[in-house]
From Swiss-Prot:
GO terms for cellular component: cytoplasm. PANTHER family: UDP-N-ACETYLMURAMATE--L-ALANINE LIGASE, UDP-N-ACETYLMURAMATE--L-ALANINE LIGASE-RELATED. The lineage of its organism: Bacteria, Pseudomonadati, Pseudomonadota, Gammaproteobacteria, Enterobacterales. GO terms for biological process: cell division; cell wall organization; peptidoglycan biosynthetic process; regulation of cell shape. The gene is murC. Pathway: Cell wall biogenesis; peptidoglycan biosynthesis. Its EC number is 6.3.2.8. Keywords: ATP-binding, Cell cycle, Cell division, Cell shape, Cell wall biogenesis/degradation, Cytoplasm, Ligase, Nucleotide-binding, Peptidoglycan synthesis. One of its GO terms (molecular function) is UDP-N-acetylmuramate-L-alanine ligase activity. Cell wall formation. This is UDP-N-acetylmuramate--L-alanine ligase. The keyword Nucleotide-binding applies. InterPro entries: Mur-like_cat_sf, Mur_ligase_C, Mur_ligase_C_dom_sf, Mur_ligase_cen, Mur_ligase_N, MurCDEF_pg_biosynth, UDP-N-AcMur_Ala_ligase_MurC. Pfam families: Mur_ligase, Mur_ligase_C, Mur_ligase_M.
Length: 491
């Protein structure tokens, strides 16, 4: 951003008083890095720490940020404020040092709230679909020439970044309920895609507590704000009478204000009609598969229509939508060496979904778009607590594929829980009598154990939120071919 553009922005968005140097602890996370990127482009001095480099930290370093790949007290020296990820413990040496030096320590969402304070904020919340819906809203507003600022939890592929500083008055942001920190946000418009039991440790295992927190989030809207909510979701339908703000509903349901009709999926695209009150029907081609993505698009269209964005811009944005990183992310179609006397190709798709509802939606999209493919899933459960709490749901959903390979649970810092491990889950699924899952004890064995189950007309779904995305990329790099020890050593 040049000096003239920055001066224009300053006339719209005042600087945070006396704040010059902002330090992020856990800066390599997508959400943290996105906020840091926006602030770097606004002209603030950015530093941060994390344990290992990744594309997020590299992008920030390219913008002039100072990144430390350790956690040491001296890293926070001279910082005006320290922003902390929810994954960072209170005894982190940088947090301790900041408190001792009386440097303010705030959560990620508090800084996001400051970015939103002087802008027209649009916040996207919900258990599933937040990242994709945020990208869709951002794409529509950009196509309409409104040049929004956006902060997303995943890579917006069209932009090549998780976040971008725009010159317009809009800030579009993913709102995270996992630690209830979205309560810091005060947007003008809020989307809620759905509400399910997840991150229940935050809510003391009480689903009513989670539901009330979503109500409180919506009541952060001004009285003239608007809540856009998916009426197909039974919990949202239950909560609607308790929302004391203007609402717009969307969904496949007949009573939705923005209704999806005549949905058809052809390969990676969805085709459907949107019916809106007092507007002409909109025939949509969406460059993203699955009924769940049609719902995400309906939410984005509801917000854009309310803002008065013309239909042509909306339709262009949805037809050219490039998606987000690790959300039904097509990594390639690769020729196979003859296996079991057969040759052919296998498609490779990487997906972040790690809740049974998300996994189910991904499987349904794959079946609808490629009904004749042999559907092979490589799944990595995420967190022992989630595996325990949703054990039966996982067992039911995972039986829908033709072949299942399962990695060990990605712990995300949790201690193992007896009976909530991958071996137990495989045993339970096997007992259902539909498929015979294969446990992959070592990620290095994935390509070797995958090859024999391919038939030459395959769609491979690499599914999960842990480090499985790296495995997906490595499979693409080696074109699904198991490597010999000599090849691995050469690499």
């Amino acid at each position: 951003m040049n000096t003239q553009q920055l001066a224009k922005l300053r006339s719209i968005v005042p600087e945070m008083r006396r704040v010059r140097h902002i330090h992020f602890v856990g800066i390599g996370g997508a959400g943290m890095g996105g906020i840091a990127e926006v602030l770097a482009n606004e002209g603030y001095q950015i530093s941060g720490s994390d344990l290992a480099p990744n594309p997020v930290t590299q992008q920030l370093m390219n913008l002039g940020a100072t990144i430390y790949f350790n956690h040491r007290p001296e890293n926070v020296r001279d910082a005006s404020v320290v922003v902390v990820s929810s994954a960072i413990s209170a005894d982190n040496p940088e947090i301790v040092a900041a408190h001792e030096a009386r440097i303010p320590v705030i959560r990620r969402a508090e800084m996001l709230a400051e970015l939103m304070r002087f802008r027209h904020g649009i916040a996207i919340a919900g258990t599933h679909g937040k990242t994709t819906t945020t990208a869709m809203v951002s794409s529509i507003y950009a196509e309409a020439g409104l040049d929004p600022t956006f902060v997303n939890g995943g890579l917006v592929k069209a932009a090549g970044v998780h976040a971008r500083l725009g010159h317009g008055r809009y800030l579009i942001a993913e709102a995270d309920e996992s630690d209830a920190s979205f309560l810091h946000l005060q947007p003008m418009v809020a989307i809620v895609t759905n509400i399910e039991a997840d991150h229940m440790d935050t809510y003391q295992g009480d689903f009513e507590n989670l539901k009330q927190t979503f109500i409180n989030f919506l009541h952060n809207l001004p009285f003239y704000g608007r809540a856009v909510m998916c009426v197909d979701d039974p919990v949202i339908r239950e909560l609607l009478p308790r929302v004391g703000r203007q609402t717009t509903t969307y969904g496949f349901s007949e009573d939705a204000d923005v209704r999806v009709e005549d949905y058809q999926q052809i390969g990676p695209q969805g085709h459907f009609t949107l019916l809106r009150q007092d507007k002409e029907p909109m025939r949509v081609t969406l460059n993203a598969p699955g009924r769940h993505n049609a719902l995400n698009a309906a939410a984005a269209v509801a917000v854009a229509t309310e803002e008065g964005i013309d239909d042509e811009a909306i339709l262009r944005a949805l037809e050219s939508f490039q998606g987000t990183g690790r959300r039904f992310d097509f990594l390639g179609e690769f020729p196979l060496e003859p296996v079991n006397g057969k040759s052919g190709t296998a498609m490779l798709v990487d997906d972040y979904g790690h809740h049974p509802t998300e996994v189910d939606a991904t499987i349904k999209a794959a079946r609808a778009g490629w009904p004749d493919k042999n559907l092979v899933m490589l799944f990595q459960p995420h967190r022992f607590t989630r595996t325990r709490d949703l054990y039966d749901d996982f067992a039911n959903v995972l039986t829908q594929v033709d072949t299942l390979l399962m990695l060990e649970v990605y712990p995300a810092g949790e201690a193992p829980i007896p009976g909530a491990d991958s071996r137990s889950l495989c045993r339970t699924i096997r007992g259902r009598g539909k498929i015979d899952p294969i446990l992959v004890p070592d990620p290095a064995q994935v390509a070797e154990m995958l090859a024999p189950v391919l038939i030459g007309n395959d769609l491979i779904l690499v599914q999960g939120a842990g480090n499985i995305g790296k495995i997906a990329r490595s499979l693409a790099e080696i074109k699904l071919k198991p490597q010999t020890p000599e090849e691995e050593q050469h690499d």
